[in-house]
């Protein structure tokens, strides 16, 4: 456990002293939870003190029901997640203040010299210089004006700023990307060549990074071969490289309602690693053989090179399966495979449901 200083040179385990340490997650600016590996503590808005979303905090447990439902108050900010806060600017006669939209709930005092030209009621970014105490309010400087707080694009920009996201990459990463090249013939020879197969990608209409592709074949004995190929990013991103380190820091791509904050530069995610039609692409392939009842009887995983035959969308695949004349003619080279896919998918779905699987048919939100 974690040690904390109690008094003078005396220490105790924080948990035994009624304290816990974890990351503060503020929900709708009304309450928060401090989460650790084996606990979750509810914190009411009035008990945030100077803590803000993403801070590592120390909480004192004020209520503990049956050891499960804990409630507490923030007594110390151990480490700031960020020194920036998003809020709405309010002007007074000789100064201004910012009302945080997703933070500790205390207004931030802005000296007049830092807000002379800032429009009233706009969403702004504040860099906090002083986090406040029992006598003084937090104080800071406005470093960016985002715009109308009710504008969708502005709200998305605020979200990006709040969570420390960035669409930009550092120069070292950009240099590495610029030096990357398509696969050579020698590199292709080291992989299993699947370019003769009519493999397809199936994605949404707006997808840019096509990272997986499929192929299905039915044998005369009733067995099915299913190939699932995913982009082999490791062909281009080597361990310990600037790209590798940046991807580790980002963790994943972030999908917002109107854009994607990529884990890799777009030259890689939408270019070299995107399984675009009629281009040689490095992939990992899982090859599976199912019998007529959907039982997996064999499988293999290997590095491969593919050349997708078509960039399909869910809409167009459904049109082919529905017998749409235009789509059937357009995709005559792969239409029969879609019916084989449908056949196998029904068999596998039946097995999934027997195992208790649940399908969530959730709508996709899009800004129009």
Model-predicted segments: where are they?
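Electropositive polyanion-binding surfaces
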Residues: 120, 125, 130-132, 172-368
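S1/OB-fold single-stranded RNA-binding interface
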Residues: 1-201, 205-213, 219, 223-227
């Amino acid at each position: 456990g974690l040690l904390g200083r109690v008094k003078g040179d005396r220490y105790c385990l924080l948990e035994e002293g009624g304290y816990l340490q974890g990351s503060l997650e503020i929900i709708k600016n009304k309450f928060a939870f401090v989460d650790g590996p084996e606990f979750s503590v509810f914190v009411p808005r009035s008990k945030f003190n100077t803590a803000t979303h993403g801070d590592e905090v120390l909480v004192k447990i004020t209520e503990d029901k049956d050891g499960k439902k804990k409630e507490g108050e923030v007594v110390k900010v151990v480490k700031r997640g960020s020194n920036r806060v998003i809020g709405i600017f309010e002007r007074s006669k000789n100064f201004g203040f910012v009302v945080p939209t997703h933070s500790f709930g205390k207004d931030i005092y802005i000296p007049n010299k830092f807000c002379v030209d800032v429009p009233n009621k706009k969403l702004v970014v504040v860099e906090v210089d002083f986090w406040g105490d029992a006598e003084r309010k937090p104080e800071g400087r406005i470093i960016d004006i985002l715009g109308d707080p009710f504008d969708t694009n502005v709200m998305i920009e605020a979200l990006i700023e709040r969570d420390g996201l960035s669409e930009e990459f550092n120069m070292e990463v950009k240099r590495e990307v610029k030096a990357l090249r398509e696969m050579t013939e020698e590199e292709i020879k080291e992989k299993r060549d699947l370019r003769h197969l009519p493999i397809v990608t199936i994605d949404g209409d707006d997808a840019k990074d096509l990272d997986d592709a499929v192929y299905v074949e039915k044998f005369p004995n009733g067995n099915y071969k299913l190939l699932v190929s995913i982009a082999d990013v490791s062909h281009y991103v080597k361990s310990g490289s600037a790209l590798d380190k940046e991807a580790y820091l980002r963790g994943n791509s972030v999908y917002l309602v109107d854009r994607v904050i990529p884990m890799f530069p777009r030259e890689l995610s939408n270019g070299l690693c995107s399984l675009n039609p009629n281009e040689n692409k490095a992939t990992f392939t899982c090859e599976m053989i199912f019998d007529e009842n959907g039982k997996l009887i064999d499988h293999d995983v290997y590095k491969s090179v593919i050349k997708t035959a078509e960039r399909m969308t869910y809409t167009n695949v459904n049109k082919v399966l529905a017998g749409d004349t235009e789509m059937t003619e357009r995709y005559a080279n792969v239409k029969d495979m879609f019916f084989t896919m449908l056949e196998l998918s029904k068999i596998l779905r039946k097995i999934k449901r027997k195992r208790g699987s649940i399908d969530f048919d959730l709508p996709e939100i899009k800004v129009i």
